[in-house]
Design a protein with these regions (language model features):
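A domain-level signal for the structural core that forms small-molecule/cofactor-binding pockets
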Residues: 10-213
């Protein structure tokens, strides 16, 4: 889908598109140690890791972790190096970028959508590269608050943008599947940089565009 200009907004909505972080051959994650640890967990909960249904589970989990945490060994800034030199100096917004990550507190998934808006200062990045940056940061043990800040800070510095806004909406399975068990509850975090932080009118505009449905 090509971006469309709406007023002073260059906007593209990304729906149901997955940007997969592919594990690198240089990824130093030790799959054997993970598999051994999973086997010990199965024993610790009273299961038989040698029964048919669990025999390959340790290796499956090891391969899964190799994929889920591949962002630990990838530099998200690499996706910001190629940009277009453009005179466009109003808001660019990419809304509803789906993501999932693993919370470092309980090692349980949280997932949702990320909205990124920025005002360029001569550097416009390819829209898919924003999703790539998200994929690298989200394929690590994370906290939603830190994930939000990391994305905003990287884009603000690497693009030398006039303003950056990142809003993350996520459902945490550590709250929906355990503990208080409140499915459907969302955590919303935001990080603002530059003009969106300094100027109330700019902040109100970008938040209105993000919330517009």
């Amino acid at each position: 889908m090509l971006p469309c200009k709406l007023g002073n907004v260059l906007q593209r909505t990304v729906n149901n598109v997955e940007y997969v972080c592919m594990p690198s051959k240089k990824n130093p994650i030790d799959k054997k140690r993970i598999a051994d640890a999973v086997r010990e967990i199965l024993l610790a909960i009273g299961e038989d890791p040698d029964r048919e249904g669990l025999r390959e589970t340790p290796n499956r989990v090891a391969r899964m972790y190799h994929e889920l945490f591949c962002g630990l060994h990838e530099d998200p800034a690499a996706y910001t190096k190629k940009f277009f030199s453009e005179s466009y100096n109003d808001i660019i917004l990419v809304r509803d970028i789906s993501f999932s990550s693993i919370c470092e507190h309980h090692l349980m998934p949280f997932m949702g959508k990320i909205h990124i808006g920025y005002i360029p200062d001569g550097r416009v990045i390819g829209l898919s590269k924003l999703a790539r940056v998200i994929e690298v940061f989200s394929h690590r043990l994370q906290l939603q608050e830190r994930l939000t800040e990391e994305i905003a800070e990287l884009l603000y510095k690497e693009l030398n943008a006039k303003a950056v806004a990142v809003v993350v909406e996520a459902e945490h399975t550590c709250m929906t599947l355990r503990g208080v068990k409140k499915p459907g509850s969302l955590c919303v975090t935001s990080a603002l940089r530059g003009g969106f932080l300094k100027h109330p009118s700019s902040r109100a505009e970008i938040l209105a565009l993000i919330n517009k449905r």
